[in-house]
A protein has these predicted regions:
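Extracellular Ig-like/FN3 beta-sandwich strand-entry sites
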Residues: 565-567
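Bacterial N-terminal signal peptides that target proteins for export
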Residues: 2-12
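Bacterial N-terminal signal peptides
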Residues: 10-20
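Boundary at the C-terminal end of the N-terminal hydrophobic targeting segment
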Residues: 24-26
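Primarily the internal scaffold of c-type cytochrome electron-transfer domains
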Residues: 28-52, 79-111, 142-511, 516-538, ...
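N-terminal catalytic scaffold of extracellular/periplasmic and nuclease hydrolases
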Residues: 107-125, 134-137
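Local sequence-structure signature of Cys/Sec-based thiol-disulfide redox active-site neighborhoods
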Residues: 53-72, 119-122
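Conserved, well-structured interaction surfaces
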Residues: 127, 131-139, 149, 156
Length: 658
């Protein structure tokens, strides 16, 4: 009887939402509620299982916090070399977005949208953003004891700690922690196959043979020979920690694989649903359903299908954990066994320079109270990220043709600009929403006057002008047939871009530049649907090879006004941006228009509430918008710039040498 009431209740909710919301929004909400109702577990769980695979909460050995369990030996200590902040594991990790994945305000604003779109799906998001909190039973699934409130859990309201508190035993805010990564296994405890997506991790939860100290095993790419001093904890050599597959655990993301008890639910819904499968599957532009789980992020797979995955491999770690060149580099402050020199630095930097600065400004003072110099580490991450971005691409500008202007007759110019991807994945890669890279092209006269510009950017509004010749590299995912147009729709009824991460089921455009040797087709996906460019042609290196070029050649034609002072200089600049204006504005608008609660109200009965840092009495979306929009000296809420674009490369050519 209670199932029947639940169905009636859901139907009533859909009807009310459709009656009172705008047509487009009602369609989205109603469709979402219907989709969710078709996947609800029977009474007793009350939620969909978005995380059915891998090690589950309820460990024999807790995931220990980084402070002081790891920092005591693996951070800076008295007498260490002055370069120690550049290589000591805890110190370098603590400034990374890995370490601060549970402090990222952009993530939390997006989390609220996801939970609104598909109630409870935050469980799937938080598995990678707070693996300690998830495995300790502080999200949706309890570790031990009474059930969690699934709504509060999926919204991260049950996590211990605060955004500005040290990563100690009282905090789940330490992101992807040392103890989590160094307990990862390639297979399950009984030989179950491993996973390379969605945080479906196998975590070592046993004692091992090297019982030098406290259990459980800490796994890593080092061994201790007989007669040498072991660490004060159990250890085991792990080849897995040198392989890219370990990164694929969270850097391949598909629409969640949901699970329920089909025998009971099918009697209720009669939909023939078999109990598990992807929440959303990828549809082609004509509506054909591929049956593939929607490929949300594919950084690991992009690498896997590139030349970098071929022998001799260049792994993720080679670029994102580069070996220190300092002869004094050590992993441990005790410096036992005299192991120094080349050491994989736990830098984990990518292209994100903006959010580490926000975390530094918003939470740095509190994080520094433990004496770990967190603000220094965050700044180091920003600096390293900028440096890495300059190595990600090559840029070459060529004047293909030029007709000089005269005092009375206009001239003409044709440019060719080649952008080559030097990374082991698409450029840009990873989280699709808001990320973009573009070519800004300017032609100036002999006096520096602007003659022509493509992809002009206004830093005061963060508006990127997308003129007909503009080159913007991004992936735009959407909802197929959302407006009844029979296409992949990426805008709402107001012609504003929408970002419904967990509802997307199609790719309208993927213009990102492939890596070297990139072959999108695989045995499991012979058409390359998951990885191929969409709406933007990248030719094969040779006809029929199946391998795409790793560069884009952009051409520009322009008229030069009569009387322009020559020679002319054409300059190309390649920029990267973490979050576009329309993404941040969408997060704010969703929070306001959908009536999201402010964070302290939403999490009112959670640990350590109310918070005195972060959103507090604001919604997470509005807080994110203020961080993006406000002036740096705003007395109420300082801003940190509108995700300022980072200059990656520049290249120029002059008519004086043409």
């Amino acid at each position: 009887m209670r199932f029947s009431r639940a169905l009636v209740f859901r139907s009533a909710i859909v009807a009310l939402l459709c009656a009172f919301a705008s047509n487009a929004n009602a369609e989205l909400v109603a469709r979402n509620w219907i989709a969710v109702s078709h996947q609800l577990a029977p009474s007793g769980t009350g939620t969909i299982d978005f995380t059915p695979h891998g090690t589950q909460p309820g460990l024999l050995y807790d995931i220990q916090p980084p402070e002081p369990q790891c920092s005591a030996c693996h951070s800076i200590a008295g007498g260490d070399p002055s370069t120690s902040p550049e290589f000591r594991p805890f110190t370098t990790w603590s400034g990374s977005m890995m370490a601060n994945a549970t402090r990222d305000p952009l993530f939390f604003a997006a989390l609220d949208v996801a939970n609104h779109d598909v109630p409870g799906v935050g469980d799937y998001c938080l598995r990678c953003h707070t693996p300690r909190g998830w495995l300790m039973g502080h999200v949706v699934k309890p570790g031990f004891g009474p059930p969690n409130d699934p709504v509060k859990g999926a919204s991260a309201c049950l996590l211990n700690g605060t955004y500005d508190a040290p990563d100690d035993i009282n905090s789940d805010m330490g992101g992807v922690t040392c103890h989590f990564c160094h307990r990862l296994m390639p297979n399950g405890p009984n030989g179950e196959p491993g996973y390379t997506e969605n945080g479906n991790a196998w975590v070592d939860d046993v004692q091992c043979e090297n019982t030098g100290g406290g259990p459980p095993c800490r796994r890593g790419p080092y061994a201790y020979d007989d007669g040498t001093a072991p660490p004060p904890h159990e250890w085991q050599y792990s080849q897995y920690h040198t392989e890219s597959a370990i990164c694929g655990t969270c850097h391949n993301v598909s629409s969640p694989d949901v699970s329920r008890m089909p025998a009971a639910t099918d009697r209720i819904f009669g939909d023939g649903f078999d109990g598990s499968g992807a929440l959303k599957t990828l549809k082609l532009d004509d509506g054909t359903d591929t049956g593939h789980p929607m490929p949300i992020e594919r950084t690991f797979s992009e690498w896997q299908q590139s030349q970098y995955a071929q022998a001799p491999e260049t792994t993720c770690q080679n670029c994102h954990m580069p070996e220190s060149e300092d002869p004094d580099a050590t992993a441990c402050s005790y410096r036992i066994n005299n192991r120094t020199g080349n050491l994989p630095v736990h830098a984990f930097v990518g292209g994100n320079t903006w959010v580490p600065g926000i975390i530094k400004g918003e939470f740095g003072a509190g994080l520094d109270t433990s004496g770990t110099n967190r603000t220094q580490s965050l700044q180091q991450t920003i600096d390293w990220s900028r440096q890495l971005l300059t190595t990600a691409a090559a840029l070459d500008t060529t004047i293909q043709s030029y007709t000089p202007p005269t005092p009375s007759v206009p001239g003409a110019m044709a440019l060719s600009i080649k952008v080559t991807n030097l990374t082991g994945h698409k450029l840009p890669t990873g989280y699709s929403e808001g990320r973009r890279m573009w070519l800004n092209v300017q032609v100036r006269d002999a006096n520096g006057g602007l003659v022509y510009e493509s992809a002009a950017y206004d830093p005061s509004t963060a508006e990127l002008t997308q003129d007909p010749q503009a080159r913007v590299y991004e992936v735009l995912q959407g909802i197929w047939n959302f407006h009844g147009t029979g296409t992949c729709d990426i805008e709402n009824a107001s012609n504003e871009k929408m970002f419904h991460f967990v509802l997307n089921d199609c790719i309208a455009r993927d213009s990102r530049i492939p890596p070297l040797g990139f072959a999108p087709a695989t045995a499991a996906d012979p058409n390359g649907y998951d990885l191929r460019p969409v709406g933007y042609p990248y030719p094969e290196t040779s006809p029929g090879s199946g391998v795409l070029v790793n560069y884009d050649t952009a051409t520009y034609t322009l008229s030069v006004p009569a009387g322009t002072v020559t020679p002319l200089t054409a300059t190309a600049r390649l920029y990267y941006q973490t979050a576009s204006n329309y993404y941040v504005e969408f997060l704010r608008d969703e929070a306001v228009n959908q009536g999201f609660a402010d964070e302290n109200t939403m999490c009112s009965d959670g640990p350590n509430r109310p918070f005195t840092v972060g959103p507090q009495s604001r919604t997470r979306g509005e807080y994110m918008y203020e961080l993006w929009n406000n002036a740096p000296d705003d007395a109420t809420q300082p801003g940190y710039g509108k995700s300022p674009p980072e200059l990656m490369q520049t290249s120029a050519a002059s008519t004086s040498t043409h």
